[in-house]
Amino acid sequence: MTNKANPSSSKEAVLDAAELFFAVRGYTAVTLKHIADKLGIKQASLYYHFPLGKEDLYVEVMLRHLEHRRISLERLMSRAEPTLESYLLEVGVWLIQQPPLNGGRMIMSDLPELSSEKAAQLEAAIYRCAFAPIEALFIHYRHELKDRFQNDPGFIGGTFLSSLESLYTVRKYGSKTDQELVIDLIELLLRGAHSG
């Protein structure tokens, strides 16, 4: 008979449990005890996989999460019709169905608590995996934007992403479908709310 390792103590199980906590609560509000309790293991067991502790666990969790997001965004964009609105709709519906990244909280609260090296690593990953794919859409389709936005595709891309994070909450209290919410956001972003 072979001895099987406790599946809840495997590195993947630790990463999965930690991701649930860090995504919702952020770095500072989560303790290693929260994660260990969720897994039904002793807190000291977490140091087997993450000898440097909470910061290393957080960084690995978030890098994995961001990379998954980047791969998913690329997959979604590869199957959308090649128009700005189709890309934004495909990506937008998917994003509001995911737990929000809470990029603002990460940048304002989580990253300052990390070592400067780890913070820079995560900040670069946030840009590369979450922001750059959307910014690239607006760069590619800048000719469809009003003149004043053509030279700042990052602003309009960031506005789209920030608005989507808000829609994650709005969708819980309204009667519109996810697709209707994203269509309205795209309309508002690309053409504005002004009727005149």
Predicted regions and their residues:
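Helix-turn-helix
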Residues: 2, 9, 13, 17, ...
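Short alpha-helical functional segments enriched in proximate histidine and acidic residues
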Residues: 21, 68, 98, 133, ...
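Short, basic, alpha-helical segments at the C-terminal edge of helix-turn-helix-like DNA-binding modules
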Residues: 62-68
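C-terminal peripheral helix-coil segments that are non-catalytic and often amphipathic
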Residues: 132-143, 147-150, 158-196
